[in-house]
Amino acid sequence: MHPRPHFFSYAAVLVVFLAVTLASAQSQPRPHTKVVALDRAENGILPILTGPPETVTMKSGYVVLEPGRSVGKHSTEHHEEILIVLEGQGEMRFRDGSRLELRARTALYCPPETEHDVWNTSAETLRYVYVVANAQ
């Protein structure tokens, strides 16, 4: 009995598909190590990691807030977020009215789907690093 002609057609298509998929996967840039100086974000945000292809899923930034300033309300959406406070004091304010104190050498965690804002409530500059990663 001879194999059906369609079998060879399907097999050829499958081989081509696998070859293209493998070549595409190998051509995707892979994350690599890097160093970012945290000295250019005066009165703002300096992106440290901007996500794929620079990382797998992670994004981060260095934030500098002058007294009385905030970053603006935003949500973590489908990300987890951690803030590492380097210098200064402030508050993380949540939609429900609750607040967490920020101060130097502390870290704060925000789970996914958390609306929040960061305020500098002191008379000195607030500096922190945030890191977000996909929680799904």
Language model feature labels by segment:
Residues P112-Q136:
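Ligand-binding loop in jelly-roll beta-barrel domains
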Residues V20-K59, E66-P67, G72-K73, R99, ...:
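A short, N-terminal "cap"/entry segment at the start of jelly-roll beta-barrel domains
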Residues T57-S60, E80, E113:
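Extracytoplasmic
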Residues Q28-R30, R93, R103, A107-Y109, ...:
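A beta-strand edge to alpha-helix "cap/lid" segment located at domain peripheries
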Residues S70-G72, T76, E91, A107-L108, ...:
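Histidine-centered metal-chelating micro-motifs
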Residues S70, E80-A104:
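A short beta-strand-loop-beta hairpin characteristic of the jelly-roll/cupin
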Residues Y10-T21:
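Bacterial N-terminal signal peptides
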Residues M1-H6:
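N-terminal secretory signal peptides that target proteins for export/translocation
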